[in-house]
Amino acid sequence: MILSKYQTAYACEGKKLTIECDPGDVINLIRANYGRFSITICNDHGNVEWSVNCMFPKSLSVLNSRCAHKQSCGVLAATSMFGDPCPGTHKYLEAHYQCISAAQTSTTTNRPSPPPWVLSNGPPIFGNGSGLIHPPGVGAGAPPPPRLPTLPGVVGISGNPGLFNVPPQHTAVTHSTPSSSTTAVGGGRLKGGATSTTTTKHPAGRHDGLPPPPQLHHHHNHHGEDTASPTKPSSKLPAGGNATSPSNTRILTGVGGSGTDDGTLLTTKSSPNRPPGTAASGSVVPGNGSVVRTINNINLNAAGMSGGDDESKLFCGPTHARNLYWNMTRVGDVNVQPCPGGAAGIAKWRCVLMKRIPDSGYDEYDDDISSTTPAPSGGDCLHNSSSCEPPVSMAHKVNQRLRNFEPTWHPATPDLTQCRSLWLNNLEMRVNQRDSSLISIANDMSEVTSSKTLYGGDMLVTTKIIQTVSEKMMHDKETFPDQRQREAMIMELLHCVVKTGSNLLDESQLSSWLDLNPEDQMRVATSLLTGLEYNAFLLADTIIRERSVVQKVKNILLSVRVLETKTIQSSVVFPDSDQWPLSSDRIELPRAALIDNSEGGLVRIVFAAFDRLESILKPSYDHFDLKSSRSYVRNTAILSNDSDVNAGEIQQRLRILNSKVISASLGKGRHIQLSQPITLTLKHLKTENVTNPTCVFWNYIDHAWSANGCSLESTNRTHSVCSCNHLTNFAILMDVVDEHQHSLFTMFDGNMRIFIYISIGICVVFIVIALLTLKLFNGVFVKSARTSIYTSIYLCLLAIELLFLLGIEQTETSIFCGFITIFLHCAILSGTAWFCYEAFHSYSTLTSDELLLEVDQTPKVNCYYLLSYGLSLSVVAISLVIDPSTYTQNDYCVLMEANALFYATFVIPVLVFFVAAIGYTFLSWIIMCRKSRTGLKTKEHTRLASVRFDIRCSFVFLLLLSAVWCSAYFYLRGAKMDDDTADVYGYCFICFNTLLGLYIFVFHCIQNEKIRREYRKYVRQHAWLPKCLRCSKTSISSGIVTGNGPTAGTLCSVSTSKKPKLPLGVSEEAHDDPQQQQQTPVPITEDAIMGATSDCELNEAQQRRTLKSGLMTGTLQAPPQTLGGHVVLERGSTLRSTGHASPTSSAGSTHLIFAHKQQQQQQQQGPLGESYYHQPDYYSWKQPSTGTGGLKTPREYYNNAGAAASSPQQAHEVFYWTQKPNSGHNGKKKRGAGGVPASPSGSLHSRTAAASQVLFYPSYKKTKPGQPTGYPQYAEALDPPLATGNAAAYYQQQQQLRRQQLHQQQQQQQQQQLSSDEEQAEQHAHLLHLQRRAGSQQQLPAPPPHMAQYQQEFMQRQYRNKHSNCDLGMGDAYYNQGSVGGADGGPVYEEILSNRNSDVQHYEVGDFDVDEVYNNSVGTGVFNNMRAAVAAGGSRYGGGSLSGGSVSSRSQQQQLKKQQQQQSLAQQRSARRCTADDDDDEDEEEDEEATAAEQLHDSVCDEDEEEDESDLEDDAHGLPPQSDERMRRLMAMQDEDFKRRFQRQLRKHGAPLDYGALPPGAGPQPEHNGAVFGVSGGVGEGSLRGAFRQQQQQALNAKSPGGRLAVNELFGHGNSGPPLPPANQTPAQKRQQLQKLSPQSTTSSSSHTSHSNPNPHPHQLTHPHPHQHPPHHQQRHLSAMLDENNTVRCYLEPLAK
């Protein structure tokens, strides 16, 4: 049943009271009174002499006769109608009524609706709207009215039945006893017979017929101060209009002593799980879903509750409170006794019965009580004897029902309203005298209130004296003719009054306020405020010129300002920042409002700020302290009016005053309207578990807070801004939310806060890793627009995460809070913009030529930067200009206030960017679908697959980021509004944000094979990482790409250990059969390359597969008799797939790629079981096979050196290679085909298939400008038998030509001089912008006669290779021959300038040390031959013979003789250099290896030490000093292992080591500068030095190239390098300085050139003279790198800055 609105009407004496209801409703009066209960109602002049205990008993009857059950009525409030209950007092008529439906009037059993403090679901804003007060009840008459709210069914108050007149109700006689008759009225309240019509107030003895109470032993404390527990109320319930019954409270009445008038307060916790059918039998009261259940018809006397231990539950135990001893008191009685010493009057305290049930819910006895039915009368028992029970059974049942109730003193403290101190009574008498000194009285009053203990009555007296003093001073001031004296007197009086008011508000007087009932507290507070205001305006009216007076005491700041209107230029603000440090509240009065209220050109304003007044002017539960009220609300509940509705569903709001009270008044304090509203900023006292702020003012008439005329402008967690159109005392009301049921987070509480911190931390870590990856491994990628876009996205996301983390810890008052919100706004807009541009970039890539080649597009990226950050900053700037406060008005520092500006500048731009990103993604998918159906070349399909993968991942990234931001937004909004779904959104945010960080790491780091390899390399190269990480197989590169066919690029071996895991394509039978296993290809696994990539040892129980150096197109064959027991791939020889970094170089190192049509000649397996390929110049030499199809043994090889001695072979480096499987016509990658894993290549995060490639890993030195581009033909290299007769002569001719070229280059270098380093930096290779490869062919010249026997295909490949390799002398016709993986046209290169200094690493590779001296029976000439063979670029060891027998010629002998001479000269130079170098390091001079090298090799003085087999830590093998220690140790270990295996192979096969015959080109090679580009430098395992140094090093005295190939070595021989700019030149002044400073300068980056070398090497073109070449940092080197588009890029090293 819907409860009608409870209303109150007033009419002053002589006026007409009109009550009117809506059509269809009638008036239902609840109570009425004609008289006066409030001093403020109908008191325009502030008269305080009127009586406030004035009442007419028949007021309700008179009003009922005129208005009951009518739609409207009017009653004149006059004594002629009601009589004159208090002559001399101006009276008013007060009526409390409801408008109910006319249909309800036919039900006569309905009881009147209870007052609003029981029925209202929400408290009215007027705290005590009725203004009703209870009479003091002095004397031995009737006791005072109860301080409990009047409950339904109240007939009257004993001894004063006319206080509230209730309409008669239907009653029923429920039980009769001989001693008394008890009538139960509508509410279940007991009305005793004639023998018990008065309330006992005799503490010593009882006169109600009950025996005296026994001595009790209480197990609980009944002390008043201790009752404010979580399970007990701490104070009394209010009787005011807005005093609401606590939520979760059930008021039960009807249990009490015989003759009591107001029953007992029984509260229980309702159960939400009440069994069905347990309907309450108590009366159902119409009204707003509330029900009051009553215990019907329980007569404790009749029930036999008159003795024994059970009676202990019906008495409150004795206790001490307020300096009084309170004896045992029966439940329902009021203990009355005189006031404490020094005070006059009486003190009272009531004993009530109260029950608490735990939160577990339903209690069985609660159902027993609520379901009790009235006992049938005697007549009914005759007709229905089954319902009659004997008295003993009734007593037992009552005892059971009441056993969980306990008696409690209520309220928490006694009522001392009538207690007045003697000294304040004296002051009251003095102030009423005619000639009293007001200043003296005011001083005495301030002294008494600060030093004496006050009681409740003293508060009333003090505020009355304050008002009386102000009224008398108003009349007395006219007696002072002097203006100064008048102002001084009033100012002194004001100071005393302010001090007195501060004393009353002091914490020491809190008990005095608690002595008053809630109504008296409000009345005293109102009187105090008006008294202060009257005295302040008394001073303001006295001042006749502009002046400001400030009175500041402990708890009150009062300011009186008199301003001239002509001086008011702006709004007036109170208080000043330095006046009131207790609070940050402020009030601002607009200038127009002040001018409108001026008088005589002056504006008089009174401001006041109060401390601790908020604890007095409580809107509800004023008799509770805050802690107790929260506890009380949390543990109690209000029941629903319907019996089938679970109890506790309707929860009452608890409102508190959540700010200090601040006041402003104009016009002598009158309630005037202002032309412009004032602005108030009030700080919240409580920021947690509060919500719904309301701006209110204190209504003097109603003694309550009201919101009329005030509105809330904005609010956040700590402050609220209000606007009011009038002046008075202002504050903020807020609802308290039960923190046990609802968690309104400070930001995030408990686990939620911890989880959010963890989530943000994880995301930030992964974003930082992604950013560092892009920065540190930037050489992995070709710098592109996509890389820049994702870098910007990561930066924005990082800023968002960090700002969010900082913002949740800030308060809205801090300046930092606004900045966080501003920057977060900008970061979110920028991040969404970058996502949009990323989608647009993918779309533009698909619709333009960018699909084929993605390079750095600086103009486009700059445009992206401008649009993203420019637009974001512009939008934020516009938002700041429009309304800066929108960034500081929200509850949290991470959100803007949700207003129109928020949606216009934040929501709409974000949605636009997201929609645009999704739109471009959709268009990109459409284009990709179309392109996939068309015939594209392999490269286009590769790029298309890359873009497809990018779009997929980006779309998922966008969706995940949207989920993160949406969940965060809804969580913050829900937390602010205390929404139950806030936790759900919070945990969604935690999950999504964590997934976002993981996705960034996996998608942009782990998913990319290039980055994975760099991670593994980083792990292996840092010794501080755990051994398990550096030795795990997961740290070894798995990017093995086999060649075309099922057996290409595989390794065959026999394993005698346990059966390994069979690779794909290998049958189990083949594995079990040793012979078949010999021929079964085994794909190269990670185990096979572990030795080349880490220093980890494998399980010694298994045989290891050994892969030696070699270069071949077919299968790498390793016989069963593998050596060494270790799997070792030589340094620099790890198989890599297309586009991957070389094993011993950093990211972005050089790669050279050949077209797959250039079929290299596969080498057969020789007797040594080694497979390798010897290709000195990479294009012109083909190893002929023997009759058996295999290479000759090392013995045969060295015996066949007759013609090879003068062969023009160039020193070279042997490289491994591999091929990717053919991707087919459509370029689509077939995963798992043939069991060959395909490694990814491509763009930043793509995984695509590339065309079949042959991959090399050289590093190059730049050549000098002016070198011819021709490539000489070496017939000796192609067919050694043809070169038998002229090899030596031809070689001598070549050496002579090189010496001439060297001389020319020296002259040119001395003459050239650049004007500045800037010009020098500009001399770089030009970028060749290549068009699409059209496949055009260039006519080949006729081959030389000695090569006519070879096939056309071989000659075509040989010729084109000589004209490729970044040859700048060629035109576009050559470069447009075909794509990389296309026709037989050779590779296509692009040459660009590398500005990344991180890609360039210079090492000294010309100087070597010798680790041990070989003392076998080998002559010096043999070692010379070995050294010459090494210098000539022979295979690693016994690489095969080029001829069929042992041939020796005169030219060869002469060449060997020259080698011996050069060796002796080199030894002398080495000794001289050692002398100079020994000054730097004397310890190394004594080293055994250095001593041996000093005798046998010209680079013996290299400062790098090499550790032996037992001690690897000192073995650096001449490694570059710049390399890290881990790589030095790794390479040293591999060199040692190679040496051991080589020696074992020689001893095993019994090789006599006859080095009389050497491979072609084994003549002496001149030294060259070894500064190279790459990590491994000249000591790479694929280098010359690594091949033969184990045995031949002792005889290696001549300079050997030792390093990776120079450009002219790779591209041609002699003067056949590509023409490059003179980037290696320095100005003449610098060269002269260098010559002066270092006449014998040798740097770590340059080799030493022999003056006496008759056959200078072409590499000397780089540094023609040892004293003239510039320092190492001035050298510039050329390198080639395979980009993500499978195109070789030649990089020219930038000059050092």
Curated annotation (Swiss-Prot):
Organism, as annotated: Drosophila melanogaster
Coiled coil: none
Disulfide bonds, paired cysteine numbers: C695-C722, C710-C724
Domain of life from the UniProt record: Eukaryota
Residue intervals of the SUEL-type lectin domain: 11-100
Residues annotated as signal peptide: none
Record gene name: Cirl
SMART domains, per the entry: GPS
Keywords (A to Z) from UniProt: Cell membrane, Disulfide bond, G-protein coupled receptor, Glycoprotein, Lectin, Membrane, Phosphoprotein, Receptor, Transducer, Transmembrane, Transmembrane helix
Residues the record lists as Phosphoserine modifications: S1142, S1239, S1246, S1315, S1316
Family recorded in the similarity comment: Belongs to the G-protein coupled receptor 2 family. LN-TM7 subfamily.
Single GO cellular component term: plasma membrane
Oligomer status and interactors: Forms a heterodimer, consisting of a large extracellular region non-covalently linked to a seven-transmembrane moiety.
Annotated Pfam families: 7tm_2 (PF00002), GAIN (PF16489), GPS (PF01825), SUEL_Lectin (PF02140)
Gene Ontology terms: biological process: adult locomotory behavior; cell surface receptor signaling pathway; proprioception
Domain (GAIN-B) ranges: 547-740
Descriptive protein name: Latrophilin Cirl
Topology class, membrane: Multi-pass membrane protein
Ranges annotated as spanning the membrane: 754-774, 788-808, 815-835, 862-882, 907-927, 955-975, 986-1006
Biased composition, class Basic residues, residue ranges: 1660-1676
Compositionally skewed regions (Polar residues) per UniProt: 171-184, 242-251, 1625-1637
Organism ancestry: Eukaryota, Metazoa, Ecdysozoa, Arthropoda, Hexapoda
Molecular-function GO term, any one: transmembrane signaling receptor activity
Biased composition (Low complexity): 261-271, 281-290, 1300-1314, 1444-1469, 1638-1659
Site residues, Cleavage: L727, T728
Glycosylation sites: N128, N242, N288, N327, N384, N641, N689, N716
Cytoplasmic side: 775-787, 836-861, 928-954, 1007-1697
Ranges of the Extracellular topological domain: 1-753, 809-814, 883-906, 976-985
Main location as per UniProt: membrane
